[in-house]
């Protein structure tokens, strides 16, 4: 039974499942013990987001770690990127208890080795799975806080990367915390950076009472759009549940895609270096890639997933990494992704530009794009094969199927966590885009 559950919850780059079904305290204990055995260090950083099952998960996971006499560096209720940054700063392995943007009945774990080195399918996660698949005596005790919270180190790290003085106090923006964990760090960030901000849904509530903490679904951005437009703000940002991803909108309430953000940030950061390397995943749009190429940015393509992009960034010594899903990675942040750091860099970018954000975006002439659309399918591989058979163009199979045609481009790939196809389309016109989407949907 445990083995079947482990098969369900161990994904390509994290652990995720329905709490009380495929994931429970016994399994969390075994994973904690396995993780502690896998990493060589005697001290492990542990934090969690605001999910309703997190205290039970924390008790079980930390009990597993302590069962082999290793110590917990507890950092409390924090975003995922706080654990990553502290793992890099302290050179200690880390774990964050979270299921990111998934519904409230889910929970899980993201793990990293010392130095914020990701633990994924090909970098130790399956070894941890094997270690967890054993019959062991389970003794779960209430976790006792050891008061080792290292928040100051994290905030000092952010200040070194983006100083408060570099951000204009004239910027007015909106934040939708989505009732996720960003609300737990907002006050401290605000005290440091003196934001001129209007905010909604900052109360951490694992029931997500206002809308799902998934900003990739544009329907969840309605309240933020209204906030920005009604108050004539410069931009807005919506965070997901563990605040490692933030989706931006411009002053007109239009979503700024991950591809657009990859261009904006790389163009801004590359002005500070003669040679600038960017790792991108397969669904960053060709238009975005062409803009970066024309700016003499060195580009490296990889599969979707934070462990994949972080590994390639280390391999090629990249400065920045961008995903169309709005995860952004920085060499100066131990190659880890950080929505909070992205917000600060974006504000610094706007502080150096007098134009409205909508005008900045329009000057790039991005063609119509679909955003990420999900299709539930029975067989992912068969569905991708069907799509390939009905299109002509230049195909790439780095991750799923990408098709480059003279009038359009698309990428279709299987989800790593669900039986779904994730589809992104870009086309010269909205009419062509609609035709491509209709052709894809009718084939599957």
Name these PLM-found stretches.
Residues 107-229:
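Gly/Ser/Thr-enriched, mixed-charge loops and adjacent short helices
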Residues 44-107, 189-249:
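N-terminal small/polar loop signature for handling phosphorylated ligands or for N-terminal nucleophile
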Residues 273-444:
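Phosphate-binding and adjacent anionic-ligand microenvironments
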Residues 43-49, 73, 172-174, 276-282, ...:
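Short glycine-rich phosphate-binding loop at a beta-alpha junction
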Residues 1-63, 67-69, 144-171:
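An N-terminal, well-structured beta->alpha segment
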Residues 94-106, 228-250, 255, 299-338:
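Glycine-rich phosphate-binding loop
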Residues 199-201, 254-273, 339-348, 352:
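Gly/Ser/Thr-rich active-site loops/lids in small-molecule metabolic enzymes
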